[in-house]
């Protein structure tokens, strides 16, 4: 495989992300469950892969990436615990303030793990995920997502990024490419959240009730975009988190949920947004017993 031109591409080091969710029995991260569903083993969450990009994005755009930047990725290949991967970002023009570039991740053998865009400011073109044709499904054909409709609210709550948990993840090697800003002083004052922690903030509690309505099933991240509106997201600071369904999708093996979520501070200032595509595996759901039996 050819080496990227350093004048055109910023390449990160090869890293071996850990599957820190392998202990969650019955999830896609559990070896036994994932193997039963046709995967090579328990998968590393796509949000974990996002943590390899900030050093490249700070080199590309400066600290401003954490203030008005985005990272928009569609996941193409599920990796397993410790499998080596490398992040790349197209090098922007010097001094770019409203710019968008290509971002991607591969294995050392050249398998594409994720692809999309990274930006700062307000570039003219849409991000990788906002440029996709979502092709909504016929709701009457859905089983796992039958209780949801585009426009539905996913909730309104307060949540925060746990600074102690983030520091523990760093010390245990669970945050693949840590910045000093995640555990100590940053250009904005105190510690800030890594991309995977921003995803957790805008996903975990917000999806708790909708997941109950879906019934037993196994899901995985299909695509994630985080965008800082007035960032960064600080550790140990409470944010109001809201979200809504954008679209529902259907394929032979999955039902898909596209949703947007938002974090605002106590003053009502938008801090960060996320667009996520969640894949629900039909073979894992009692709603699709025929598929599971096949």
Region spans (language model):
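An N-terminal domain-cap segment
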Residues: 63-79
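HotDog/MaoC-like acyl-thioester-processing domains
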Residues: 1-18, 80-84, 88-149, 230-294
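Short structured motifs
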Residues: 70-75, 223-230, 245
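Hot-dog-fold acyl-thioester-processing enzymes
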Residues: 2-68, 123-223, 285-294
């Amino acid at each position: 495989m050819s080496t990227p031109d350093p004048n055109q591409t910023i390449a990160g080091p090869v890293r071996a992300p850990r599957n820190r969710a392998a202990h969650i029995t019955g999830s896609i991260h559990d070896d036994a469950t994932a193997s039963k569903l046709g995967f090579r083993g328990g998968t590393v969450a796509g949000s974990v892969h996002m943590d390899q990009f900030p050093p490249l994005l700070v080199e590309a755009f400066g600290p401003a990436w954490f203030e008005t930047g985005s990272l928009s990725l569609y996941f193409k290949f599920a990796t397993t615990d410790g499998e080596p991967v490398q992040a790349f970002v197209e090098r922007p023009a010097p001094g770019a303030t409203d710019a968008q570039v290509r971002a991607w991740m591969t294995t050392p053998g050249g398998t594409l793990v994720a692809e999309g865009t990274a930006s700062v400011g307000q570039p003219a073109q849409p991000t990788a995920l906002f440029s996709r044709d979502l092709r909504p499904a016929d709701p009457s054909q859905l089983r796992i997502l039958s209780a949801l409709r585009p426009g539905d609210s996913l909730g309104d709550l307060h949540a925060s990024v746990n600074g102690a948990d983030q520091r523990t993840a760093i010390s245990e090697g669970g945050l693949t490419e840590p910045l000093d800003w995640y555990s100590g002083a940053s250009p904005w004052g105190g510690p800030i959240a890594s991309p995977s922690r921003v995803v957790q903030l805008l996903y975990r509690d917000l999806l708790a009730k909708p997941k109950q309505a879906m019934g037993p099933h196994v899901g995985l991240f299909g695509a994630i975009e985080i965008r800082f509106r007035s960032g960064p997201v600080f550790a140990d600071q409470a944010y109001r988190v809201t979200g809504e369904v954008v679209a529902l999708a259907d394929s032979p093996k999955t039902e898909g949920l596209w949703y947007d979520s938002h974090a605002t501070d106590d003053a009502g200032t938008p801090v960060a947004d996320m667009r996520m595509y969640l894949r629900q595996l039909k073979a894992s759901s009692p709603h699709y017993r025929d598929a599971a039996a096949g």
